[in-house]
């Protein structure tokens, strides 16, 4: 049943966190899924056939846009198959990536099927990125690194978004010139989000108040690409599927998980969550993604 096109006020976009493994160790990450890995999913991901089936069921239910997230989704050996399947089923396709694994082979292979690339860029200072864990043994991103990456993304014809998480580490930085040069269609700026069971161990030193977040926002308020989200804005407004194939939602600072989509179907699993359509609209969740 295509529930979404029947006129119901149901959020039309879904984030599929298909892959727990990541090659960076961002201290503030709200999607580490160690709880999932330690209890029901030792490998941190489902089998390829299961992930393809989930994509098919999400499309059949009527989701119009799917964002592949991790961990780091480009580490998944069959990510291109998932992107292609989602595209052929009529969904707008997107990935959120740290960019470290965006090879030219990947960009060529997915040209016809992947609509958007969202880069996670919190700082253009390598020292800040090292402090928060946004680096690998060989990659310490700075402005030059990101400029080259963005240029390559545009050369292959992809639409660009940038996601920035504001923490104590980058609170006083200014990304105006960088973002204006990058010209993403959307620059989403998030207040660092504490989630019990995901980032408890490292988050305290990075937390900021809403007042501090607003100071960062005000510094960038004239930036035409800017879209901001406080912790309150984010809560109950993202339809998310975890690596085990369950919808999940942040409720009172904890993740609550639905039954498995492959066992009970999308509709029953979806209805177990308390997603808020009106808040989704308020945070500008609908835009020209086609």
Curated annotation (Swiss-Prot):
As its record notes, the protein acts as a catalyst of:
UTP + AH2 + S-adenosyl-L-methionine = 3'-deoxy-3',4'-didehydro-UTP + 5'-deoxyadenosine + L-methionine + A + H2O + H(+)
Q: Which GO terms describe its biological process?
A: defense response to virus
Domain Radical SAM core span(s) in chain numbering: 6-226
Q: Which SMART domains match?
A: Elp3
Where on this chain does [4Fe-4S] cluster bind? 22, 26, 29
The EC number of this protein is 4.2.-.-
Q: Cross-referenced InterPro entries, in alphabetical order?
A: Aldolase_TIM, Elp3/MiaA/NifB-like_rSAM, RSAD2/Viperin_antiviral, rSAM
Molecular function (GO) terms listed?
A: 4 iron, 4 sulfur cluster binding; lyase activity; metal ion binding
> What's its top-level EC category?
lyase
Q: State the Pfam families in the record.
A: Fer4_12 (PF13353), Radical_SAM (PF04055)
Entry keyword set: 4Fe-4S, Antiviral defense, Iron, Iron-sulfur, Lyase, Metal-binding, S-adenosyl-L-methionine
Cofactor section: [4Fe-4S] cluster
Q: Taxonomically, which superkingdom?
A: Bacteria
Similarity section: Belongs to the radical SAM superfamily. Viperin family.
Q: Which PANTHER family does the record associate with it?
A: RADICAL S-ADENOSYL METHIONINE DOMAIN-CONTAINING PROTEIN 2, S-ADENOSYLMETHIONINE-DEPENDENT NUCLEOTIDE DEHYDRATASE RSAD2
Q: What does this protein do?
A: Expression of pVip47 in E.coli (strain MG1655) confers resistance to phage P1; has no effect against T7. Catalyzes the conversion of uridine triphosphate (UTP) to 3'-deoxy-3',4'-didehydro-UTP (ddhUTP), probably via a SAM-dependent radical mechanism. The modified nucleotide represses transcription from T7 RNA polymerase-directed genes (possibly by acting as chain terminators), strongly suggesting these nucleotides block viral polymerase transcription. How this protein allows bacteria to resist viruses that do not encode their own RNA polymerase (such as lambda, P1) is unknown.
Put simply, this protein is called: S-adenosylmethionine-dependent nucleotide dehydratase
Q: What is the lineage of its organism?
A: Bacteria, Pseudomonadati, Bacteroidota, Cytophagia, Cytophagales
Gene that produces this protein: vip47
């Amino acid at each position: 049943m295509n529930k979404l096109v029947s006129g119901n006020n149901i959020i039309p976009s879904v984030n599929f966190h298909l892959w727990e493994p990541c090659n960076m160790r961002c201290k503030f990450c709200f999607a580490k899924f160690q709880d999932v890995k330690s209890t029901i999913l030792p490998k941190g991901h489902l089998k390829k056939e299961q992930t393809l089936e989930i994509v098919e069921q999400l499309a059949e239910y009527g989701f119009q846009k799917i964002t592949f997230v991790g961990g780091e989704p480009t580490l998944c050996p069959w990510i291109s198959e998932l992107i292609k399947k989602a595209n052929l089923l009529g969904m707008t396709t997107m990935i959120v990536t740290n960019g470290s694994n965006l090879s030219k082979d990947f960009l060529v292979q997915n040209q016809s099927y992947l609509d958007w690339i969202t880069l996670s860029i919190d700082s253009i200072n390598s020292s800040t990125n090292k402090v928060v864990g946004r680096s690998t043994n060989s990659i310490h991103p700075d402005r030059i690194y990101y400029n080259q990456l963005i240029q390559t993304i545009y050369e292959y014809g992809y639409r660009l978004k940038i996601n920035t998480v504001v923490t104590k580490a980058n609170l006083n930085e200014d990304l105006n010139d960088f973002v204006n040069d990058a010209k993403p269609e959307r620059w989403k700026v998030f207040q660092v989000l504490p989630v019990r069971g995901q980032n408890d161990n490292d988050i305290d030193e990075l937390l900021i108040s809403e007042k501090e977040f607003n100071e960062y926002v005000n510094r960038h308020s004239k930036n035409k690409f800017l879209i901001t989200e406080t912790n309150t804005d984010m809560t109950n407004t993202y339809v998310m599927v975890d690596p085990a194939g369950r919808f999940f939602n942040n409720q009172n600072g904890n993740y609550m998980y639905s039954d498995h989509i492959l066992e009970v179907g999308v509709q029953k699993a979806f209805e177990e969550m308390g997603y808020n359509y009106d808040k989704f609209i308020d945070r500008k969740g609908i835009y020209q993604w086609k």
